[in-house]
Structure formats: C-alpha cells, structure tokens
Amino acid sequence: MNKIRNDFNPNLKQFFINLQNYLDTELYFYGSVNRSDYVHNKSDIDIAIFTDNEYSIMTKLQHYLHVKPNTFDKIVWKLEGTIVYGYKIKCDKHTNSKCEIAIYNNDFKEIILKDMHKYNSIPFHIGILLFILKTLHYTFPILSSKTYSAYKRVVFNQIMVNKKDTSFVLLKQNKV
C-alpha cells in the first residue's frame, strides 16, 4: 500500500519519491493504483498521508507544489459511525496524471487503512464490472466522468461492501 508502482513512468515515479522524501513521511497509495484494473494515464492515483500535524504537512505540500492555502479542500467523512476529518488536494498538473492526496490525522489511521484495504483486492465479479465500466469510460467514451463515478460508487459501496453507515462530504474552498 505504501509502495510506489514500478511500472509508473520514470518522471511520475521520481515525483513520488521526491515528495515522500521532502515530506519525510510515508505515502499510502490506495484504490485501483494497487490493483490490476489500474489504467496508466487514465485511472487516478489516490494517496493518503497520516500525520500528527495536518497543518505542517499542508504547509510543506503548499511549498512543494507551489500552491495557495485555499487549494486544499476539507473532508468530512462518516466512516462506520466515526466522523473523520481531513484535507484533500489535487496535484494533476504536477504529475501529468489524475492524482489526489488526502491528509488525515494519525487518530484516524487505523479506521481509514482498514477501509482502504477492502478495496485493494476485489472479487472476480467486481473486476469484471470495473473492466466494463472502464472500457465504456476510457476506451469508448460513452460514460461521462460523473456517470462513471456514480456507477463505480454503486459497484463498490452497494454491491461489494454494502456500506450503509458511511457518507463523505468534500467542502470546496473558494479558489480565487
């Protein structure tokens, strides 16, 4: 989960190595980037960072990525009855890939990692459904990004895991 893929292009791989060294903390990759259904240059790269001081990591990221403080969005997530808080930043333009980094306090590390592990290996039938969705979205762009995301949430949260006591809110900052 905290390994940088060997098959990333050299620039992308170096970006994550440099970022990890600069932040002096582990990067936890999660989602399709850890599975065989990852599509290079199409699938997004999701990363979680756990820390005792979110603001310190955000400041370091701000300097590393040369972004303003309002680039970070606030996360409020009800996960298995626990309210989780954090921050997210998109770093697409720095990686030339769809990439998102989430920053959480170490207090939430155990529950978040437990949730992330559920998605690192998937049953065969879920893999087939994802293959169909990704083909319709990436290869034959029949599904819009919004529709693709909605169907993917249904596949994961209702068919695979059947999440009932979970909700996720992303509070967007005013980007001026």
Where are these regions (language model features)?
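Catalytic core of pol beta-like nucleotidyltransferases
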Residues: 1-17, 22-23, 34-42, 51-176
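Acidic Asp/Glu-based divalent-cation binding sites
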Residues: 44-46
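Glycine-rich beta-strand-to-loop/alpha-helix junction loops that act as flexible
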Residues: 30-32
